[in-house]
């Protein structure tokens, strides 16, 4: 067996998704804690907390207690290498989350036991369904009162359209929480609130008939549990690995992330059943992870991960072959070889140099503006991985500068921050305006904050009469030039130099499309097609 095949089989690359405040970042911390990657988990609840979550590394995230960027973390567990991608729960950063989901092989969905399936969860589930991504579910905050577990499973099946297969089942809830029972092994894990956020090994009884269990949880609760389990085992599906890997069934776990409870069974089950790196589609062929030659694609760019050096890092998912430090790789979009020196692996913002990487791993490449989201790297073959889109923004603002002498820094900041993909930067052909597009208001706050803290620029964003944007293409260059001349007041270029139509109203866009039927107007821009691969 080749080294690439063996190492690929060890990898598990997944993302954690949820509605905001379901406890996703806290659960991320606890998975790292149980995986031995960190010694003490940070509380993300209080702004004044002494510790902050490992995955919420940006200053703004620590102040607000929310995740607005995606973090990448790698740790070993039970002979496997786990690559965990934490994603922003906030709806305004959905595009970042969408692209992260293109870089993983499975997902873990976190649901608040009191709130059930929420709006953001539904949207993320739709994205996962597009790719048939296998999903495990963790129903969180069991230490609080919440919905009836049976009703909750029914809600997940009804609203999300995926079959539930409970693997653990709660014994009580809120103040009456006593533990969970593993339906596959019959083991009972008793609940003990976490102390000092360190790893807790829960007390385990080998079965519901084990001596001493009734004394610990109470005779009546044990009797109620037997009754409930009879009902759930008759009404719900048993775990089927084939259905799970096909994205049609989700194994369900119950627990309390903040109390370290229910995390261990989840992690053990995940390592055993989650898929190793899968094959990937390109515009020309399917790439198998076990191929010996390196391929990979960039799904994220992060500016200023190290405030001391004002760096930009491109996050690349390795799809096949083996990466070695300092190797040259073919950058398909530019048709040039780039030396991938000083590549990094991550624990949120803590980075260390990586000597080698295999399929499923995510590495950071230092980027001086040459690498963009969606770019493919190979060992010479012209390939382009598909499914990494840019979406048309829904909100637009004009950047206004307090100090005109800082214009250069403002342009640099807007360009670099837009490379991350959460916002888009447009320059109208007929004016000197600097237009920023986003899908949510929070993104403008984040950009203003980062411009000030990372680029020393005080900027505000004022409304502008733009309703929507469309990328415009035409195979006939003469026709495109004629369209450009007639519509120059509505045209701009994005940070990649692509032509974009900025429509003041929906009616204006409709008229423009009717008047130029040979011009293609796109609401999304597939990065793969920007490299000229047919």
Curated annotation (Swiss-Prot):
Any S-S bridges, and between which cysteines? Answer: none
Q: Which GO terms describe its cellular component?
A: cytosol
- SUPFAM superfamilies, sorted: EF-G C-terminal domain-like (SSF54980), P-loop containing nucleoside triphosphate hydrolases (SSF52540), Translation proteins (SSF50447)
Q: Name one GO molecular function term.
A: translation release factor activity, codon nonspecific
Q: Which residues bind GTP?
A: 18-25, 86-90, 140-143
Q: Identify the Gene3D superfamilies for this entry.
A: P-loop containing nucleotide triphosphate hydrolases, Peptide chain release factor 3, domain III
Provide the protein's localization.
Answer: Cytoplasm
Q: Name one Pfam family in it.
A: EF-G_D2
Task: List keywords of the entry alphabetically.
Answer: Cytoplasm, GTP-binding, Nucleotide-binding, Protein biosynthesis
Please name the GO terms of the biological process aspect recorded for this protein, alphabetically.
Answer: regulation of translational termination
Q: Does the keyword Nucleotide-binding apply?
A: yes
Domain tr-type G stretches: 9-278
Q: Which residues form the signal peptide?
A: none
Checking InterPro entries in the record gives: EF-G-like_DII, EFG_III/V, G_TR_CS, P-loop_NTPase, PrfC, RF3_C, RF3_dom_3_sf, RF3_GTP-bd
According to its UniProt entry, what is the function of this protein? Answer: Increases the formation of ribosomal termination complexes and stimulates activities of RF-1 and RF-2. It binds guanine nucleotides and has strong preference for UGA stop codons. It may interact directly with the ribosome. The stimulation of RF-1 and RF-2 is significantly reduced by GTP and GDP, but not by GMP.
Query: PANTHER family, from UniProt?
Result: PEPTIDE CHAIN RELEASE FACTOR RF3 (PTHR43556:SF2)
Q: Family assignment? A: Belongs to the TRAFAC class translation factor GTPase superfamily. Classic translation factor GTPase family. PrfC subfamily.
Q: What is this protein called?
A: Peptide chain release factor 3
Q: Which gene encodes it?
A: prfC
